[in-house]
């Protein structure tokens, strides 16, 4: 992607194809990691080995009545993407405040946790909120539910759940990194502001910002180690960064300590808190021999296996693109068609937005999918 006069992004065909592959990889990779961990999320490593053998899980196991089921991690990640697309569409109206659009998307997710199914009368909700399979509670985090329990948006000045540093914000924040036309400090800031809508502790929202910046670097074609170093620089400018900074440094240090093992993963924590989930996901992505190896390492530990698997999958999928993902897992993945549609819509909006909507006219089909209201 190159820049022309007026900072207009010019995308060549190969660049568009590469970007779409990374967006697909991010969403599908995260969902696969989520699904691998969904059935063992609350189990100890000993219990996992007793049930699935010494290597732990090596494939999807049944969760929520099926193989390949995803959790709230993937649900909220998809609504993050929906909110980001809506922000771009609403920009034509002169309304440009992406945190508000992402918050509205999260409120639509919250409805899926309360209602039996979509309300077809709410045409302004857009297409994603009408996907019936999303109307299922998959162990959503308490901070996410309470933070979105009313329509008041948490901000950095007045965050929701000011003491919460659970991983519920970081696990949904990879899509901010797909805003490759943005500067990294703006990506960091947007992710942080949106994280504070549910998680008000500095570690809770700064880990989300760091994850977004790491994903942003990967989406731009940079390597993972350099992406982590860049995130550390951004973290260092923020008050209250110490826990997240230390967690990322521990992940980098663990890489140099020898062969990756579940014990080494567990030395980084259990993943219930934001900084631990980020540390484990980053470590497993750094040492991954391939996507399969990295994801299985990320879920086979006693702790929040689905969230650490999702974070690792987001990273590896963004780094390598969709074609690196194991097809045997893709074919059983819940909601894959929805994810592909959403990924392609996001890539199209980022690369072809002016052709879809603007002052000169808009595609009615696009505005039906992503209403400006």
Show the residue positions of the predicted features:
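Structured, active/binding-site neighborhoods that engage oxygen-rich ligands
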Residues: 1-373
């Amino acid at each position: 992607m190159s820049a022309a006069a007026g900072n207009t992004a010019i995308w060549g065909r190969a660049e568009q194809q590469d970007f779409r592959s990374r967006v697909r990889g991010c969403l599908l990779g995260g969902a696969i990691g989520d699904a691998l961990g969904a059935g063992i999320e609350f189990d100890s490593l000993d219990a996992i080995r007793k049930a699935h053998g010494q290597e732990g899980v090596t494939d999807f196991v049944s969760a929520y009545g099926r193989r390949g089921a995803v959790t709230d991690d993937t649900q909220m990640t998809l609504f993050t993407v929906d909110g980001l697309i809506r922000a771009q569409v609403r920009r034509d109206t002169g309304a440009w405040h992406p945190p508000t659009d992402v918050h509205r998307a999260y409120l639509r997710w919250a409805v899926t946790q309360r209602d039996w199914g979509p309300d077809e009368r709410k045409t302004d909700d857009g297409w994603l909120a009408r996907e019936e399979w999303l109307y299922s509670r998959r162990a959503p985090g308490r901070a996410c539910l309470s933070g979105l329990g009313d329509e008041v948006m948490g901000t950095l000045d007045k965050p929701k759940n000011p003491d919460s540093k659970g991983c519920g914000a970081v696990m949904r924040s990879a899509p901010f990194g797909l805003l490759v036309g943005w500067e990294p400090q703006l990506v960091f800031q947007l992710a942080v502001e949106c994280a504070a809508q549910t998680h008000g502790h500095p570690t809770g929202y700064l880990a989300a910002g760091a994850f977004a910046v790491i994903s942003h670097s990967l989406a731009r074609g940079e390597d993972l180690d350099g992406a982590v170093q860049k995130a550390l620089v951004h973290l260092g400018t923020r008050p209250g960064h110490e826990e997240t900074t230390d967690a990322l440094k521990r992940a980098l240090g663990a890489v140099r300590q020898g062969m990756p093992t579940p014990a080494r993963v567990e030395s980084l924590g259990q993943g219930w808190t934001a900084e631990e989930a980020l540390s484990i996901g980053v470590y497993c992505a750094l040492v991954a021999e391939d996507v399969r190896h990295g994801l299985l390492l990320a879920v086979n530990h006693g702790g929040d296996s689905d969230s650490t698997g999702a974070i690792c999958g987001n990273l590896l999928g963004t780094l390598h693109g969709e074609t690196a993902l194991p097809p045997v897992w893709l074919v059983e993945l819940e909601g894959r068609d929805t994810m592909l549609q959403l990924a392609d819509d996001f890539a199209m909006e980022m690369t072809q937005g002016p052709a879809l909507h603007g002052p000169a006219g808009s595609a009615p089909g696009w505005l039906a999918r992503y209403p400006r209201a």
